[in-house]
């Protein structure tokens, strides 16, 4: 977070239209590894490692959300299945399958709650035709205030600029940074 603080002081993020953290799933593993320090190689412990990591990740995301630019965070999905029943004669299992954010513990629930827009990128066919799911359709957990307000459809093309424009927001790029390096202001 120190790097973010330094960049905030220099006005670095005022030159960004969008900041992307790719991916939360990988970032979480780094946070846990850093938190474990000299215990590297051991299995992470729930209270000692996972809970502090979850709090750190949530606080870091809140800090990123306060930047003067749009924020996109990508993450992997994890398949979760819930057994509904088993047919006694055939042995066929009936399960409810959902795909949720792949992160630690309760962050599966708490991190998505920080966002107004939670989308899932899907693909159909071969080669896959990509589209963004903006609403909970079957097994994918997505939601959108913009969709709820009638600005977006349940499935949209995978173009963030077009989504912004469709919802009535500016999709213009910010001007390029001048040749001098913003980091030089620190030195």
Regions found by a protein language model. Give the residues of each.
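Short glycine-rich substrate-engagement loop in P-loop NTPases that contacts/grips substrate
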Residues: 1-12
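Conserved, well-folded catalytic cores of nucleic-acid-processing
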Residues: 7, 27-30, 74, 114, ...
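P-loop NTPase motor core
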Residues: 18-110
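Conserved GTP-binding G-domain of TRAFAC-class P-loop NTPases and closely related GTPase folds
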Residues: 79-187
């Amino acid at each position: 977070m120190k790097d973010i603080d330094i960049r905030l002081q220099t006005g670095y993020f005022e030159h960004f239209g969008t900041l992307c953290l790719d991916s939360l799933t990988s970032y979480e593993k780094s946070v846990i590894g850093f938190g474990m320090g000299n215990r590297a190689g051991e299995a992470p412990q729930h209270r000692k490692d996972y809970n502090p990591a979850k709090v750190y990740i949530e606080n870091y995301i809140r800090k990123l959300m306060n930047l003067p630019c749009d924020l996109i965070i990508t993450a992997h999905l994890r398949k979760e299945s819930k057994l509904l029943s088993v047919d006694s004669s055939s042995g066929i299992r009936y399960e409810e399958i959902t795909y949720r954010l792949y992160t630690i513990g309760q962050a599966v629930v708490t991190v998505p709650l920080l966002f107004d827009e939670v989308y899932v990128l899907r693909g159909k066919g071969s080669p896959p035709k990509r589209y963004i799911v903006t609403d909970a359709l079957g097994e994918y957990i997505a939601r959108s205030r913009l969709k709820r307000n009638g600005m977006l459809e349940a499935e949209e093309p995978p173009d963030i600029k077009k989504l912004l424009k469709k919802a009535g927001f500016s999709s213009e790029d910010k001007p390029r940074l001048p040749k001098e390096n913003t980091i030089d202001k620190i030195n």
